[in-house]
Design a protein with these regions (language model features):
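Glycine-rich, flexible loop motifs
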Residues: 1-53, 80-139, 230, 245
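C-terminal auxiliary extensions adjacent to catalytic cores
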Residues: 2-34, 38, 42-45, 50, ...
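Polyanion/phosphate-binding surface patch
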Residues: 54, 69, 256-257
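FAD-binding core of FAD-dependent oxidoreductases
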Residues: 57-79, 86-111, 139-161, 176, ...
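Acidic, glycine-rich active-site loops and adjacent beta-strand->loop/helix elements
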Residues: 63, 89-90, 109-110, 130, ...
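Catalytic or ion-translocation cores adjacent to nucleophile or general acid/base/metal-coordination motifs
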Residues: 73-88, 359-372
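Mid-sequence acidic-hydrophobic segments that form the walls
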Residues: 86, 106-110, 125-136, 141, ...
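Cysteine-centered functional microenvironments
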Residues: 138-143, 320-324
């Protein structure tokens, strides 16, 4: 039976969002009378404020620079519908199913903070979309990250009123048709509900949750690959000695060194004379590269999770003090900072693995391993092993590195210069995912190469099998899915299979 995540009953974590995205947990909305009163009190206060004095942005006025347009009361109900319609201009690929679930979960949780002036009924229908896996088709391109993710989130807002297409049971269908089939009633917006859904950071925040989770595993896997290559290269295990890292006590640096050290079985390694007293930087300094993620992870998590558990639309409706605040909480600067930082660290890990890959296939540096790790028992001149794969690794790494320019510096004035400073957080998050995709490809290739190198050393009796004691699970997992490379063959499918296993966090780290 699946664990249940209850929205409205405490704070969500990155792990909660990822679990919802992957359908590893069930989702419920807090149904207590107290929570329902908390949410509905915001919508009721907004109605009262509207009746008393009017003049509420996005309710009685146009949007953005058009806020000087004051609407007659008979147009109030049509305004939010128009908002969803004219923002239906996104382009690019649609977000995948996992990311779409994450977007809905994040927006649901931010609206559940009780400062958005929405009804409990709105939260309920978004929950029903999640529970029934009704997934709005949300284009990835078109958000500048302030006012939030207006265009992407318009596809969620439009879907709950029956005006957008969704994916349901693998088919593209009208949301109205799917809701009728399931006995659901399309939502009827109250005054601020469309802008409450749209004017926030849920798309970039959801992508950030997915990116953080992938980067965390990739960092762990990079430590494991480094340990495998250190053994295969007959490297100096004492580059990762605990006492050494007490002299420079960055916690993440020490943690990375420990993860590498734990793979090396130092009880055996201490009796092995390394080929050189000092290995190249791509081995010796690996903890200093990978450890940057561990040292920054708490800060990145804080940025992502505070945003996740905040009200981030405009205006903020506070029924508790009976105030309506016009501000800029839709600005995605914190997520942009997190993603600009994370993509830089991930790309550096790819660059590290690229250097390790280049070293282990090159007979000038790989300490008597065969050229390109060709595993044939006879002549090496026909077989070229991982030669082309290493070229691919260079290409993937270069592509990842060129995406590390921070997106925040590309802010553009837009929307009649009302949105004259914007975050670009959504593009930063999407860039981070692309950097992760490329870096995972680098890791897949390097993992296979490191396992091949270890196998060759073992077959030649050049290393003791006990050296692999702490790496055996990962080593066995590789060869359970990957036939050793003895003669040249196409490796594309092997790489794709390994990539999917990495993304499912299959390998022991």
């Amino acid at each position: 039976m699946l664990k249940t995540v209850v929205i409205g009953n405490g704070k969500l974590t990155i792990e909660d969002v990822v679990a919802i995205a992957k359908k590893q947990v069930a989702v419920e909305l807090d149904c207590s009378a107290e929570f329902q009163r908390k949410i509905d009190s915001g919508a009721e206060f907004l109605d009262e404020a509207l009746a008393e004095h009017g003049g509420i942005y996005g309710v009685t006025t146009g949007y953005g620079d058009s806020c000087t347009q004051v609407l007659p009361p008979e147009h109030y109900s049509q305004l939010p519908i128009n908002l969803t319609r004219f923002h239906g201009c996104g382009l690019g690929d649609y977000f995948d199913a996992e990311t779409t679930r994450a977007i809905m979960a994040v927006r649901l949780n931010t609206l559940a903070q009780g400062f958005s002036g929405v009804s409990y009924a709105l939260l309920k229908i978004i929950t029903q979309f999640l529970q029934n896996d009704i997934l709005p088709l949300i284009p990835q391109e078109g958000s500048v990250g302030a006012s939030g993710d207006l265009t992407p989130l318009s596809y969620l807002a439009g879907a709950v009123i029956g005006e957008r297409d969704v994916m349901y049971k693998g088919e593209r269908r009208s949301s109205l048709e799917v809701m009728k089939e399931l006995g659901m009633t399309p939502h009827k917006f109250r005054p601020k509900e469309a802008i409450a859904i749209m004017n926030g950071t849920a798309a970039m925040n959801a992508v950030a949750c997915m990116a953080y989770s992938r980067a965390e595993y990739l960092s762990d896997l990079a430590c494991r690959i480094t340990a495998m290559i250190t053994v295969a290269m007959k490297g100096n295990a004492y580059h990762y000695y605990e006492r050494l890292f007490e002299a420079k006590p960055h916690p993440g640096l020490g943690l990375s060194a420990k993860k590498i050290r734990d793979g090396l079985n130092l009880e055996v390694a201490k009796n092995v004379v390394p080929e050189k007293i000092q290995d190249p930087y791509s081995l010796r300094c690996a903890p200093h590269v990978i450890g940057l993620f561990y040292d920054s992870s708490a800060f990145l998590r804080q940025l992502i999770e505070i945003e996740l558990n905040s009200a981030n639309d405009n205006p903020i409706v506070d029924p508790f003090t009976r105030n309506i605040f016009h501000g800029g909480h839709f600005y995605g600067g914190h997520i942009c900072l997190a993603m600009d930082t994370l993509k830089n660290m991930v790309a550096n890990i790819a660059d590290l693995l690229d250097r390790q890959m280049a070293m282990i296939v090159d007979i000038k540096f790989n300490r008597n391993l065969p050229p390109n790790l060709a595993g044939s028992k006879g002549d090496y001149d026909i077989n070229h092993g991982f030669k082309a794969v290493q070229i691919g690794v260079s290409a993937w790494t270069a592509e990842a590195l060129h995406l590390t320019m921070p997106m925040s510096v590309f802010s553009r004035s837009t929307e009649c210069h009302n949105q004259d400073k914007v975050s670009m957080g959504t593009i930063a998050a999407r860039d981070c995912i692309r950097v992760l995709e490329l870096s995972e490809q680098v890791a897949a290739a390097t993992l296979l190469a490191s396992a091949q190198a270890l196998r060759i050393r073992l077959e030649r009796d050049e290393i003791d099998v006990d050296r692999l004691k702490n790496l055996k699970e990962t080593y066995d997992q590789v060869f359970a899915k990957f036939a050793p490379l003895e003669c040249d063959r196409q490796l594309e499918q092997d790489l794709r299979n390994t990539l999917e296993l990495i993304r499912s966090k299959y390998y022991a780290v």
